[in-house]
Amino acid sequence: MPPLPATYRLQHPKRSVWSRLGLWGLHSLCVLLLGLPILTQAQRQDPLQSQTQTQTQTSTKQSTQEVQSQQQDKKAQNAAAEQDAPPTPTVAPARAISLAPHITEILFAAGAQDHLIAVDSSSDYPPAAKDLPRVGDALRVNPERLLELKPDQVWAWQANQIGPELQRQLEQTHISLIFAAPEKLDDIPAFIRLAGDSLDTADVAVPIAALLDNQIAALRQNSRLGKTVSVFLEIGSEPLYTLARDPLIQDVLSTCQAQNIYARHAAVAPTISLEDVLHKHPQVVITAYRDPAQLRARHLFWEKHLGLSPHALLNLNPDALYRPGPRLIEATRELCEQLDRYRAQVS
């Protein structure tokens, strides 16, 4: 900054206090002097404001205490109401009766075994089913015994197993009647799901049904490229009869790329002649015998009359093959594997 001119310094050799304060100092002093009355007035009003603030704080504190008290009273009232309220009634598990072996197996697979209170006389699988009371067989049901057990659900195979009179009684007593007659492999997991839904065991039934669905799909996928094989399914030997137009057996055979030589027969389980079988000359004979001696005799019979080699004579568990329950899917897998071995032998 350049020095001040000499004339300026000479003209003001001595300045008073006011000149030293300058305009800014004079302004600050005025503000200070003018503000004293305001400050004094504000100080005079402090007691009133303090009293008001105290009253406000007291009022707020009282309001908070009142709200807290009301909340505590409400909690106490709710607790008292909960104590005085009657207990929630528990719903008794549904009670079910099975009138067919495959239905018993379906209900067990669905996790509903604890709901079963009785079964038919042929239900022997799983082994625990043998311990349940009996209410008749596949053809005759004891109505008095069935109604005496007071079931919520009755699972039957077909309507003629029940009869119109018992159906009427079940309807009058509000007992549900459910028919379970699978006509294809996919129906088996579907009935397992139904059992899970109706008996509240879906947590078990749904994953089991999904597993069976996947197994069926895998069987169809694996067998679809196999060459079709003609088969004769021997159900009984004296007289000789077979399964023809049974839709479930047809689905089992088609899943394994097998063709029933009696698929076009008018009857479901016709009696047939040996001559007719010889005329149709199947590539494979499928039997289902438990007794080893009987099985050996039947295989020798077909070796003699049809000239079939041992690998063309197949045998399966009769209960697994002829009961439309979960084990039929495993029997289908075994049949597909045996047919694949036959194809490998003749290719």
Question: What label would you give each PLM region?
Answer:
Residues 2-104, 201-232, 281, 334-347:
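Bacterial Sec-exported substrate-binding components of ABC uptake systems
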Residues 90-95, 153, 158, 164-241, ...:
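Extracytoplasmic substrate-binding proteins
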Residues 94-149, 153-166, 261, 289:
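A short, structured surface patch at a secondary-structure boundary
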Residues 104-109, 124-129, 239-244, 287, ...:
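Short, solvent-exposed loop/turn elements at domain surfaces
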Residues 112, 131, 172-174, 256, ...:
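Short, structured coil segments at secondary-structure junctions
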Residues 120, 246-269, 289, 312-315:
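His/Asp/Glu-enriched short active-site or ligand-binding loop at hydrolase and phosphoryl-transfer sites
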Residues 143-150, 173, 272-281:
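Short helices/loops that flank or line small-molecule/ion binding pockets
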Residues 161-172, 284-305:
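A ligand-binding cleft/hinge motif common to bilobed small-molecule-binding domains
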